[in-house]
Amino acid sequence: MFIFPKDENRRETLTTKLRFSADHLTFTTVTEKLRATAWRFAFSSRAKSVVAMAANEEFTGNLKRQLAKLFDVSLKLTVPDEPSVEPLVAASALGKFGDYQCNNAMGLWSIIKGKGTQFKGPPAVGQALVKSLPTSEMVESCSVAGPGFINVVLSAKWMAKSIENMLIDGVDTWAPTLSVKRAVVDFSSPNIAKEMHVGHLRSTIIGDTLARMLEYSHVEVLRRNHVGDWGTQFGMLIEYLFEKFPDTDSVTETAIGDLQVFYKASKHKFDLDEAFKEKAQQAVVRLQGGDPVYRKAWAKICDISRTEFAKVYQRLRVELEEKGESFYNPHIAKVIEELNSKGLVEESEGARVIFLEGFDIPLMVVKSDGGFNYASTDLTALWYRLNEEKAEWIIYVTDVGQQQHFNMFFKAARKAGWLPDNDKTYPRVNHVGFGLVLGEDGKRFRTRATDVVRLVDLLDEAKTRSKLALIERGKDKEWTPEELDQTAEAVGYGAVKYADLKNNRLTNYTFSFDQMLNDKGNTAVYLLYAHARICSIIRKSGKDIDELKKTGKLALDHADERALGLHLLRFAETVEEACTNLLPSVLCEYLYNLSEHFTRFYSNCQVNGSPEETSRLLLCEATAIVMRKCFHLLGITPVYKI
């Protein structure tokens, strides 16, 4: 937001200047005069509002948005007949030309050049935009380069003050505010009676990070675990349970043992034993008919699975609310009837389907035997989330292999009028697809027995390797066993998460413990160690950092101090970009670059014992705070010593 002087007379002068600019424009047609009159009325109110806000607000957390609001006023003053033109502000790729750029001049020139404009080209438009830019303490200077690019240099004094305010008020004051109020993030979603494997890792940690970023951005997030807890497979599981444990009340997790082995054994018998297969099919009918004996057995199997899932979620520090397939089952019939009443459902080869333009096959919503399927359940879940949970944004995190399924049922929902045709308008839906996890041989990540890798085994291995690395550094002699164990867990689990999240989610990535546990390069280990080093610098100073926050002053006089400060101030716009594009890798890139900026600063700017010690300790603390917030958003536990 703009930073205007608090002096009332100077604020009134600016308001008058803005109003004068609007009133002293000449127009030649009645239409232009009417448009100008309406614009003058709206802009006069807007100008007063802008000045009032500017007098009371400082840094709101998003540099790009604040600059955009400044240039929005400038655009309205410079080209009042083009009220729909939005400011185009971006961070400068090359810092030597400025910190940010406004790139409106060329596009604006192409709009106005045939309308008898006074301007002679894009550079002139750029100069006019700079001249009309409201005074702001955040802007040190503006200059026009080339074909009208406006380079903006921020005030180092203002930047320092903004960081000081964050140190006092907390980093949550930098959180962006998105236009959406409530979102559903559907992620993880394992199948009952099957162990979570490495494939669930990506959905779980990508979904958790998206949820965390949205929550930080003032969005109410409904974290949904759409577990596979319904379907024909439960017939064979229940029947096998009855055979092994006639007294189902005595069934415990210990008695069943490995649920994955139990599932495979029941599937093996189902495939080979016709009598068992027939019983299993009858069991499905009884389960779906509500038979209490079969419902009880089904609930027992689900409970055992949930216990195993909960252990994984606890280790990953992931929170979810389960609303599986069975939750939506009672609503399916009425949803299908609603679709049918709208003329969307047709008969095809005994099944009931929805034909969709652009797809070779229809979307089946009722099978030929009258049963429901994934599409009917997913459509019902979407209907429920829109109508009962009042979600504005529904995000599904699954592998890219399911893209067509989501495209089809999203299109069916639009055809039904549940969603707008414009996929950028709320309520909206997004499929957040992700690629495969590969082994170092470039093939799908599996064990030697060709089975999928169990997630618990993977986490155990990460923690074990991390602990061994710490012992090799002699930490077992410096720390208590509890400290060693907690740090090994934080580093090991953090390494697994970051190795996934730093990649563009759409790409496949190679799983390598050696790479992810490397303490050099773009790894969680390097970043966690960097944070611990910053904490060590502050501790070694012997200063009370909380007291310095209250009394100390921060300056960004050295080039590396300024570069670090600028990067810190770009945190909010980075989080907003990561949320908007549903890309956690954007935040990972920011975090890694933050550590690189700090390394350059620390290499070139002495902290402890220097004349600038107080200021630089505050900059260290600000860096540590933002790093910790990044770790939190990525679901990684920070370490404070190493």
UniProtKB/Swiss-Prot annotation:
Single Gene Ontology MF annotation: ATP binding
Entry-annotated residues carrying N-acetylalanine: 54
Subcellular compartments: Plastid, Chloroplast; Mitochondrion
Catalysed reactions listed for this entry: tRNA(Arg) + L-arginine + ATP = L-arginyl-tRNA(Arg) + AMP + diphosphate
Gene3D superfamilies xrefs: Arginyl tRNA synthetase N-terminal domain, HUPs, Isoleucyl-tRNA Synthetase, Domain 1
E.C. code: 6.1.1.19
Organism domain of life: Eukaryota
GO BP: any one term: embryo development ending in seed dormancy
Keywords, in A-Z order: Acetylation, Aminoacyl-tRNA synthetase, ATP-binding, Chloroplast, Ligase, Mitochondrion, Nucleotide-binding, Plastid, Protein biosynthesis, Transit peptide
Transit peptide, UniProt annotation: 1-53
Function noted in UniProt: Forms part of a macromolecular complex that catalyzes the attachment of specific amino acids to cognate tRNAs during protein synthesis.
Protein name per UniProt: Arginine--tRNA ligase, chloroplastic/mitochondrial
Chain's gene name: EMB1027
